Every structure is written in structure tokens, then in C-alpha cells.
Amino acid sequence: IKVCVKKQSGQVILMLERIIEKTNRYIEEMPKKERKKYGQFFTSIETARYMAGLFVIPEQTTVTLLDAGAGSGILTCAMIERLDKIEDIKEIIVTCYENDENVLSLLQENLLYMQECSSKKIDIKIIIENYITSQYLDFNHMLGGNWNPEKYDMVIGNSPYMKISKDAPEATAMPAVCYGAPNMYFIFASMGLFNLKDDGEMVYIIPRSWTSGAYFKRFREYFLTEGKLEHIHLFVSRNKVFDKESVLQETIIIKVRKTSEKPETVTITSSKSNSDFGELTSLTVPYDLVVAGSDYYVYLVTDENEVEVLKKLHKFDKTLPAIGVKMKT
């Protein structure tokens, strides 16, 4: 990879390191309450590289990438860093959605810096619009929408974490996946899957709350019908995923392929935090054990013992209420 050098204390800093450094300065200077308006939390360098490494890169000379809610461009940079090493790729077409005016100038500066550093031809488009409402006609196949919207080979994202009202424009734009007062993260993930080409891959870091409960049923039904989980990464520590942020939400990384064909297995990996991806535990679990039932619950097993327990549970053909056992949690 071509190295963009910046001397600091005798060290050579690579492209992504420099962008992380600039992002950290932005975090220090921008009040958290301002970033909270957009549900904005930035991805760590280790997490960004791990996410970029999960993709199976298409064997093409030109690849297209979407990063919605791009922030300062950390995930885009991690992808370009990886794609730069692949000789057959000649051109990378990048689309970033970002409508936070506070971070836009930093994003533009970082994307231009990536262009200078990369050995590839990089075409960049920043769309300064609301990622959801600007596409609601397309998503819902409504009159006036684009019947042939642009689709991407790869979608990467760290979506906003922000609960919105059931009457918010983003919620009313996507009734197929929303129930009650939804969270922006799963609305973004749904649109990301919509923006993906058939058989394309999407890697997102999102809270794990969507994996169960009636509240998320519409989202799970859409997401796991239109796409299939291939890889889930779990963090054992809930407070070490976003280094400089106070995020106590349990977070996971998911890799999804846009296909109707169900894979035989799902890979489930786990690490203690975002800094020890080199020390992963890994399980290969039958898909029907992980994604099960008409409610599309996702069971996040972490070891072989849990897999065996789940196999036994799935053999039960009745629920506890069905046999007269009432429970409260």
C-alpha cells in the first residue's frame, strides 16, 4: 500500500492513523450534545480494519462502495486501505451520505486525502441529504421514485444510535420495518440492504437489541428475508467498543449477504474488546439454529455448550404459555 507519511515523534503514520488522529481532535472539540443530535459515535481503528477485512472482495476491476452516515470517513478509509492492496482493482467508486454540517468539512478533507494516498483511481460522491427520507419513494416503490436506483457491491456502516418518535419522518418513510418508536440504527441497516446489489455484502456495527423481541419483528422479517447472516462478531465487554465514547449499549458486528439462499452455517466470533481482534474465539453454527422461527429470532451462542442447549430447546414444539406455565421477567 502506498504510505502517506506524516512525521510525528519519529513515527510514520499511515492513512487511517492520520484520519483517526484528526477525528479524535474533532471529538475533543465538538460538544457531545452536538454529536448526540445525530446519534454520532465514531468507529475505532481496530474495529474499522476488522470490518473491512470481513468482505469477500468482488473479482472486478471497478468496485462500488456505500458508506451511509459516513462521519469523518473512517470506515471508507479502512476499505480503501484494504482495496489498495488488491492488484486487479483499478477503480473504487465511493458514495458517502452525511448531513451533519459539523463533520462535513472533515469528511471532505479526509476523502481528498485518501485520493492522494491511494494507488487506485478513486471517484468520490458525498450526498448531503437525509439518507432515509431522500430514498423513501424508491424503498417503498412509490410513484415518483426511481425504479432502477443505484446499487452497490459493498455497503459498510456504523449507523446512528438514536431513538426517534413513531411520527418522525424516518419512521414514517419505512413502515415496513418500523413498529412503535424505532431506533435509527435498524432503519439505516434496512436501507443499507436495499442499496446493496444482489449477492453483495454488507458489514455493519450495530446494537444487538434487534435480535429478539416483538418490537423488532418487522425489521428482522425484512432484513433476514432480503438478506442472510454470514458472520456475527460479539464483544464480551460492552464499554470498550467505542474508545472515546460512553456507550453502554451492547454492540455487535454483522456481515449480511443480499440473497434469498440460506447458507448452511453462520460464523460467530467474539473478542473481549475492540483492541484484541487477534485473540478471537470462533464457532461455526448451523444457520437454522441461529435464525429460527416465524419471529426470526437470532440466537447469539458463544460456545459449544450453548449450541447443544439450543439444539435441545429447538426440539420443543410448545411454548410455556401453551402448556399453562405463566412467567414474568
How should these model regions be labeled?
Residues 62-71:
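Conserved class I S-adenosyl-L-methionine
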Residues 107-121:
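Short, conserved SAM-binding/catalytic segment
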Residues 120-131:
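Conserved SAM-binding strand-loop segment of SAM-dependent methyltransferases
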Residues 5, 13-58:
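S-adenosyl-L-methionine
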Residues 66, 95, 127:
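Conserved Rossmann-like nucleotide-binding pocket used by diverse enzymes
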Residues 36-37, 41-50, 70-77, 89-91, ...:
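Signature of N6-adenine DNA methyltransferases within the class I
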Residues 82-93:
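Conserved S-adenosyl-L-methionine
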